[in-house]
Design a protein with these regions (language model features):
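Cytosolic regulatory regions built on CNB/CRP/Popeye-like sensor folds
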Residues: 1-141
Length: 141
């Protein structure tokens, strides 16, 4: 089922807890983009200047020899918004994909003007880091 941009943002764990008004403002700063099956959305090793929120369709994210399949409502490339490091994964369209491209520069400006939103996003980033830490501890004891 196709989601509206705000619905996709609302269902994204990355944006959970944000107000409807904030979600609408983020949706307005984004640019709708389309990808065909097999098309590269994000390429490992490249500089990241934007993140993508998937509106519909499925993708294949390959990192560290593992393949994940993010779908509607999920964000990909979000770490590029906070790091000057190269992309760590390749994301390709598993079929037709519609996404919202959120440029890093616009998103940074938005966060500077809205510190409470920045704190909410930071909480989500910290939660993801904790999940990764838990997995590493489970693998290596």
């Amino acid at each position: 089922m196709e989601q509206t941009t705000v619905e996709a943002l609302r269902s994204s764990p990355f944006f959970s807890g944000l107000s409807e008004e904030d979600l609408e403002r983020i949706a307005e700063m984004g640019e709708p983009v389309s990808f065909g099956e097999g098309e590269t959305i994000i390429e490992k090793g490249t500089s990241g200047d934007a993140m993508f929120v998937l509106l519909w369709g499925t993708t294949e994210l390959e990192a560290g020899g593992r393949v994940h399949k993010p779908g509607a409502g999920q964000a990909v490339g979000e770490m590029a918004l906070f790091s000057k490091k190269k992309r760590t994964a390749t994301v390709t369209a598993g079929g037709p994909v519609e996404a919202l491209r959120i440029p890093a520069e616009r998103f940074h400006d938005f966060l500077l003007q809205n510190p409470s939103v920045a704190v909410g996003i930071l909480e989500q980033v910290v939660e993801r880091l904790r999940e990764v830490q838990d997995r590493v501890e489970a693998w290596y004891g």
